[in-house]
Regions:
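Acetyl-CoA-dependent GNAT
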Residues: 2-78, 82, 89-99, 128, ...
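Conserved catalytic-core motifs of GNAT/GCN5-like acyltransferases
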Residues: 107, 125-143
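Short glycine/proline-centered loop/turn elements that form peptide/ligand docking sites
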Residues: 89, 112-115, 132-137
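Residue-level recognition of the GNAT/N-acetyltransferase active site
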Residues: 76, 80, 109-111, 136
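Conserved hydrophobic beta-strand within the GNAT/NAT acetyltransferase core sheet
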Residues: 70, 104-108
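Short glycine-rich hinge loops at helix-strand junctions in the catalytic core
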Residues: 83, 123
């Protein structure tokens, strides 16, 4: 990882930076309330990536028994294609494994080719499709999973 990068635990103090990345990354962004709700959950994993003292990406999810669900992952537009999303994903899988998770699940828009390529490269496989699950624009949701017993 780059010398100027570190992972942090995210909380409400990071809300402004999270919202800035979220709103530029997704057609249907999470609200402040969505983030605050997740932060309050004991099962939540909320990790940010800091580069040169700036929040450049985040990954959010939660553990349920032996499963971890990756709920959201985003990198600021100007920091994409530098491997930050891969680093965030690996960090989340490691933290989930340390909490006892054996499997990771996620859902991704069918049209999000960059995210699907990332997940394919990191060992996820499509296991189901939620037809017309997303609106604005209408899109299918691809359910993906992978084992995290071995990283």
């Amino acid at each position: 990882m780059c010398d100027e990068c570190c992972f942090i635990h995210l909380g409400s103090v990071h809300l402004q930076g999270l919202m800035a990345i979220e709103q530029r990354s997704f057609a249907s962004p999470w609200s402040e309330g969505d983030f605050l709700y997740l932060f309050a959950q004991d099962s939540a994993l909320c990790v940010g990536l800091i580069h040169a003292e700036e929040l450049v990406g985040y990954a959010l999810g939660y553990c349920a028994a032996r499963d971890f669900h990756l709920a959201s992952l985003a990198v600021a537009l100007e920091f994409r294609r530098r491997g930050f999303a891969s680093r965030l994903l690996q960090q989340m899988l490691l933290r989930a494994k340390l909490r006892g998770a054996e499997r990771c699940t996620l859902e991704v828009r069918a049209a999000n080719r960059a995210a699907r390529l990332l997940y394919d490269k990191t060992g996820f496989r499509a296991v189901d499709v939620r037809t017309a699950h997303y609106s604005g624009p209408r899109d299918d949701g691809i359910i993906m999973e992978r084992s995290i017993e071995i990283l």
